Amino acid sequence: MIILWLILALSALLYWLHRANKDYHILSFFTKRIRLKDGTPVEIIAPIAKGKTIFGNTLDLYGRDHAGVFNYSRERAKEMGTSYIEYVFGKAIYNIIDADSAENVLNHPNLITKGLVYNFLHPFLRTGLLTSTGKKWHARRKMLTPTFHFNILNQFQEIFKTESQKFLLQFEGQDEVTITLHDVIPRFTLNSICETAMGVKLDEMAEKGDRYRENFSQIEECFIRRLSNPLLWGDKLFEMFAAKDFASALDVVHRFSSEIIAKRRDLLKDELDKSSSTADDDGFVSKKRFAMLDTLIYAEKDGLIDHIGICEEVDTLMFEGYDTTSIGLIFGLMNMSLNPDKQELCYQEIQEHIDDDLSNLDVGQLNKLKYLEYFMKETTRLFPSVPIMGREAVQETELANGLILPKGAQITIHVFDIHRNAKYWDSPEEFRPERFLPENVQDRHTYAYVPFSAGQRNCIGKKYAMQEMKTLMVVLLKQFKVLKAIDPQKIVFHTGITLRTQDKIRVKLVRRT
């Protein structure tokens, strides 16, 4: 009789699981499914990726190294051929590789919150402009947007030029030199972001800047370790088993940013003591402020932000302004070395518009360098600094294609794959700056190219980044040819917080005569 009751109970359980599985992906730890309103199979819009275990896609990344994590998404994109669905550890994930879906998500009012993976960055960046949401994000965005106004960028240009010239001093007296870009470019971009956005020169803090970069790499290593192991997704388990080196690296980078803030406070102290009202009609600092950090310090005086908030934004701006821009420059110089004909076109354009003494190298002159801009845009198409972006549905949300995302669903926008989608790009693996000529852009989907994101959460520093990259390219190409020093076929990409390679990229500089 007991056996009969057990059989009946098991049968009832299996029947219930079968019924429940229509709404939940049971084996993926009761994940609420993505569905269509009329109940038709969701696969007609977005195929479901088969996991390598019975637990959906939960363990698909387990045990993969950095290259394996990166290649997983590339393999999935090729296999599925369109945007697709995964079920991972209690969460539905909508993976986007087409421009239409990207446009819908990046402009959807319900999809402003960053995805859960960004929570792994909270110990580092806390909830600054990159990771915050809701009213806090709106307030910080409104506060910081004026600090990247074109009038402010014009003031930064002299710093970009000076830092670019200082960058070349390390090669003085050398007619030929092979350089490792990952060793020299990040130092340049860190110096630039600290002097422009923070108002602090790193000349006397060079060693501390190097330690910052080293420990940033350690933070990134921990981020990938956590991403690829579901057992470490919970904060408690991560803190118990894998956070020791993470904590020490955090201490170094936070002490560095705190010292930057303290130095700038000292420089502004006299002015703050003497100042009267510095806010505009909206209660925010005047657009005439020189540095972003100045804006934050004055906003603190007016009660609009506290010290922790300043730390959040400084850590965020230093990360985004130093790391993502350095990646653009590294791959930009690599592409110069691999495409000598394109490099020559850039050089001839520079010679036509820019004097050799660089005394008049201002934003107006940079804006004349159209082909150089196309070159850098093509670089960021093939090698976007941020290859994926994430969003979370904080409430049930219907997309334009009919998919209904349950509350808590994750959305991953695969920028790397959208940028190489043959639907939008002819011979997508080929490097062709001419793709960005006006006549070639006008009929292309606007969201087929989103290296700086798009919509209401687009990157406020995209003009800053392009201006900095173009300035260094001008100063360098005036003096050097950039020659090939690596085999591009041997490049192995890694997943990081941003786009990485297994081996450091090198180029050869040959002085022009």
UniProtKB/Swiss-Prot annotation:
The keyword Membrane applies. InterPro entries: Cyt_P450 (IPR001128), Cyt_P450_CS (IPR017972), Cyt_P450_E_grp-I (IPR002401), Cyt_P450_sf (IPR036396), Cytochrome_P450_Monoox (IPR050196). Its EC number is 1.14.-.-. It comes from the Eukaryota. GO terms for cellular component: endoplasmic reticulum membrane. CDD domains: CYP4 (cd20628). Signal peptide: none annotated. Heme binds at E320, C459. It is an enzyme of class 1 (oxidoreductase). May be involved in the metabolism of insect hormones and in the breakdown of synthetic insecticides. This is Cytochrome P450 4p1. The lineage of its organism: Eukaryota, Metazoa, Ecdysozoa, Arthropoda, Hexapoda. The gene is Cyp4p1.
